[in-house]
């Protein structure tokens, strides 16, 4: 349900037509990577975004456990004139909890959560390195720590574009909310920051069905 709530929050606030495509490994014959390190396919398939976009234009990747509270075209306009390879919020934090929802282990590593929200410049040579072959074989470190790019070519977005609920101090001006510990639909997370907004969005979505 989290994906549909996020998609609804994007579409209803966008000032221009937006195409939203879920990345589903079962619909990606190019993705052949096995569970070699215990990670899920979603850990890696996000890096196929430039390939799936034909290495043309800009593409925005978002984790599904988010909520958009702004016109999403703002972030694309913010990055449109840059030649950087990719734009992210450059989080620098240590997770407060050792586990996430459903008991999942909270791994700690450099550039953690940078890849949860990425604006790709698909024309960039670095993005063209993200071929199915590379995504199928490269290490998680190579992908998630942006070794396919370089630090000076990773553009920085303001923190309100990927506000980590439960990790950062409350921010009423957050534009994209990230329920990184667990979405409000999970027990124990229904009273967290921006939970009311998430449930309201879900109700508006269901009312349109």
What are the functions of these language-model segments?
Residues 16, 22-24, 117-209:
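A glycosyltransferase accessory/donor-loop signature
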Residues 78-143:
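Conserved catalytic core of nucleotide-sugar-dependent glycosyltransferases
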Residues 55-56, 82, 112-114, 150-151, ...:
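Short, well-ordered loop/turn elements at secondary-structure boundaries
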Residues 51, 76-79, 107-110, 145-149, ...:
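A general structural signal for short secondary-structure junctions and capping/turn motifs
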Residues 45-95, 119:
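GT-A fold catalytic core of metal-dependent nucleotide-sugar glycosyltransferases
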Residues 1-45, 52-55, 196-209:
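N-terminal anchoring/stem segment of glycosyltransferases
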Residues 33-40, 100-105, 171-174:
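Short, surface-exposed amphipathic charged segments that create phosphate/polyanion-binding patches used
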Residues 26-31, 94-96, 162-166:
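A short acidic, often aromatic-flanked loop/helix-cap motif at beta-alpha or helix-coil junctions
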């Amino acid at each position: 349900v989290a994906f549909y709530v996020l998609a609804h929050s994007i579409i209803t606030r966008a000032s221009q037509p937006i195409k939203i495509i879920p990345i589903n490994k079962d619909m990606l014959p190019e993705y052949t990577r096995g569970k070699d390190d215990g990670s899920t396919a979603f850990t890696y398939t996000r890096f196929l975004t430039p390939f799936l976009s034909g290495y043309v234009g800009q593409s925005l990747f978002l984790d599904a456990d988010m909520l958009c509270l702004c016109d999403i075209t703002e972030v694309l306009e913010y990055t449109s004139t840059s030649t950087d390879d990719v734009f992210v919020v450059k989080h620098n934090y240590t997770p407060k909890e050792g586990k996430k929802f459903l008991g999942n282990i909270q791994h700690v590593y450099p550039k953690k959560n940078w890849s949860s929200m990425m604006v790709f410049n698909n024309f960039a040579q670095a993005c063209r390195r993200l071929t199915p072959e590379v995504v199928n074989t490269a290490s998680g470190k190579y992908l998630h720590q942006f070794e396919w790019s370089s630090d000076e070519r990773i553009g920085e977005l303001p923190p309100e574009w990927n506000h980590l609920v439960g990790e950062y101090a409350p921010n009423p001006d957050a534009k994209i909310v990230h329920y990184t510990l667990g979405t409000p639909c999970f027990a124990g997370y229904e009273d967290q920051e921006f939970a009311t907004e998430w449930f309201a969005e879900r109700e508006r979505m269901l009312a349109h069905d």
